[in-house]
Design a protein with these regions (language model features):
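Membrane-embedded alpha-helical bundles of multi-pass transporters/translocases
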Residues: 2-268, 272
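Short "domain-exit" segments at the C-terminal end of structured domains
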Residues: 273-277
Length: 277
């Protein structure tokens, strides 16, 4: 059975929401905790790096859990729904840090940021893994994947274009308050978009998934030189994207400087985001 336009649209809406959440964390968490709350750059960077190493083990472990899941609602939708609710709560907590002394804030950031990564993986892995289970048609699977990737880019672009505008509009002179409001808005939109996605998608194709242990996955990876090249390329590409998204705001604030740095930053974002591939 071919997918309907309604299902493809709902899947794309889900991608918009989940990548709005990802982009907000990836692009602004360092700025929020370093420049707004005053933690040291070295500590924030250390936590971000530790989280990426943790993800290397968390992602395949999550894949194993999803593969072993059996429920009346299917294998994937329960994880997408529960992961979305938890991640929305954690995202808000990430950008609504309470007033704490430096040591307590360091602990708070470390715990909440790791939890954000875990809960995001809870919904992201099953979101993409669901594609083969909702249609048997190879063309539909390719189209659904393309819709998801395209709409994910829309979600990222929305965050890049409007976050700092909303921070200023909602928080006034307080960036701390502005980020809290933005996180609340994005969290609510995230839940709504994933509810739309879960309501429209149905697992119509039995997808028996052979599971391997995390140890077996890494063992197979290290024995395959071609897979290592692909993984290495992905790491380099994602590192470049992550560094750019995190540090471009610092370039405008400290290198270009001046009272109008936000206007210059937003001008570039509004020009570049709609034209990127």
């Amino acid at each position: 059975m071919e997918l309907t336009l309604k299902q493809k649209t709902a899947f794309g809406i889900g991608a918009v929401g989940k990548d709005m959440v990802y982009a907000l964390s990836a692009s602004y968490v360092m700025y929020y905790y370093q420049d707004v709350l005053g933690l040291s750059a070295s500590f924030v960077g250390l936590v971000l790096m530790a989280a990426r190493f943790f993800d290397a083990f968390n992602d395949p472990f999550m894949g194993v859990l999803v593969a072993k899941t059996r429920t009346r609602w299917g294998r994937f939708r329960p994880w997408i729904f529960s992961g979305t609710l938890l991640n929305a709560l954690v995202l808000y907590a990430l950008f609504a840090a309470p007033v704490l002394d430096e040591a307590a804030l360091m602990v708070y950031f470390s715990v909440v940021y790791i939890l954000w990564g875990v809960t995001y993986t809870m919904m992201d892995i099953p979101y993409w893994s669901m594609i083969p289970a909702v249609t048997r048609t190879p063309k539909d699977r390719e189209n659904l994947s393309m819709v998801g990737r395209t709409c994910a880019g829309v979600g990222s672009a929305l965050i890049a274009m409007f976050t700092m505008l909303l921070v200023g509009a909602l928080g006034g002179d307080s960036e701390r308050a502005g980020f809290r409001w933005v996180a609340l808005i994005v969290s609510v939109l995230f839940v709504v978009t994933e509810l739309v996605c879960c309501a429209a998608m149905r697992e119509t194709t039995p997808s028996e998934m052979k599971t391997a242990t995390v140890k077996e996955m890494f063992s197979a990876l290290f024995r395959n030189d071609q897979a290592m090249v692909v993984v290495g390329s992905i790491v380099l590409i994602n590192s470049a994207l992550y560094l750019t998204s995190n540090f471009i705001i610092y370039f405008f604030k400290y290198d270009l400087g001046g009272a109008g740095w936000k206007a210059s930053y937003l001008s570039l974002i509004h020009i570049s985001e709609p034209t990127r591939p």
